[in-house]
Amino acid sequence: MSYREEAKSILEQAKNEITNAENSKVLNDLRVKYLGKSGIVTSLMKQLKDLPNEEKPIFGKVVNELKESIEKLLDEQKEKITEYEKEEAYKKLWVDPTMPGAIRSVGHLHILTKVRNELEDIFISMGFSVVEGPEVETPWFNFDALNTPEWHPARDEHDSFYIDNEHLLRTHTSPVQIRTMLSRKPPLAIVSPGRVYRRDYDATHLPMFTQMEGLYVDHDVTVKHLKYFLEEFARRLLGENTKIRLRPSFFPFTEPSFEVDIYFNNRWFEVLGSGMVHPNVFKNVGYDPEEWRGLAFGFGIERIAMVKYGIKDIRDLVRNDVRFLENW
């Protein structure tokens, strides 16, 4: 076979392989096969030195033309493959705007935050302002100023978290009322939400829970005002047909004192404590009990959430179980 025929045969073989190359890797392998250091065309060029001088120019021309033809085929196929690979990449990136979006988890407020916000809004709408205070208190603010003597069980270390002899974690938010009365002149109407701490843990009690207490001080305040605020609070929270009842009780900082039950979902729930501010509390903050009268009430926000949403175990509110939390 003459070298022209051999070159023609090589070109036909190369054309067939190159035009059928499907990706850049295959095409690069073919470039090495034909034009690499040990490639077919390179091997032909090495034969040049063994030819007679008169044949060398013709042979060299044939081999160079073969090389140029193969390079052209490779470049053309590379362009086609590059374009094809771009199109495939675009297809992978393309998104059909008419398809429904991917469902993503959406965060929301914790149920206790929702209930607290709702409670604050209710009392703000009735003219109360929201006041907060420190969670670490002295016994005077937490007990003495609230007419709770040293012999009272609530002051026992088994019931309260003492940091040292002079400080403890507050057992209620009532100290906020004392601080407010010491810094403001009456009349006043406040609610004080916040975390409180007691040594108690079971299905209905937590060692740390959130409480909201209310205080209203003015001239001629009576139990009728207390009953009005509590009835209005219950109706706005749980519905217009919600009923309440007051039962006589005892708290050292109120006189008279009442436990308050709310009738909801065909049963009575014990929800909060309340009463008329004890004269000794007014004396401790410099208010004249002959001139001013006050009412007070307090409840656990967790308890309100349990009643409103039918939650059986208070501990579910702090376990951070997503299966529970996503229900609210």
UniProtKB/Swiss-Prot annotation:
Keyword tags: Aminoacyl-tRNA synthetase, ATP-binding, Cytoplasm, Ligase, Magnesium, Metal-binding, Nucleotide-binding, Protein biosynthesis
Location of this chain's protein in the cell: Cytoplasm
GO cellular component, one term: cytoplasm
EC number: 6.1.1.20
UniProt binding sites for Mg(2+): E255
Enzymatic class: ligase
Main location: cytoplasm
GO molecular function, one term: tRNA binding
Family annotation (SUPFAM superfamilies): Class II aaRS and biotin synthetases, tRNA-binding arm
GO annotation terms (biological process): phenylalanyl-tRNA aminoacylation
Entry cofactors: Mg(2+)
Family annotation (Pfam families): Phe_tRNA-synt_N, tRNA-synt_2d
Catalytic activity: tRNA(Phe) + L-phenylalanine + ATP = L-phenylalanyl-tRNA(Phe) + AMP + diphosphate + H(+)
InterPro entries from the UniProt entry: aa-tRNA-synth_II (IPR006195), aa-tRNA-synth_II/BPL/LPL (IPR045864), Phe-tRNA-synth_IIc_asu (IPR004529), Phe-tRNA_ligase_II_N (IPR004188), Phe_tRNA_ligase_alpha1_bac (IPR022911), Phenylalanyl-tRNA_Synthase (IPR002319), tRNA-bd_arm (IPR010978)
Family: Belongs to the class-II aminoacyl-tRNA synthetase family. Phe-tRNA synthetase alpha subunit type 1 subfamily.
Description of how the protein assembles with itself and partners: Tetramer of two alpha and two beta subunits.
Protein name stated in the entry: Phenylalanine--tRNA ligase alpha subunit
Species assigned in the record: Fervidobacterium nodosum (strain ATCC 35602 / DSM 5306 / Rt17-B1)
Gene (UniProt): pheS
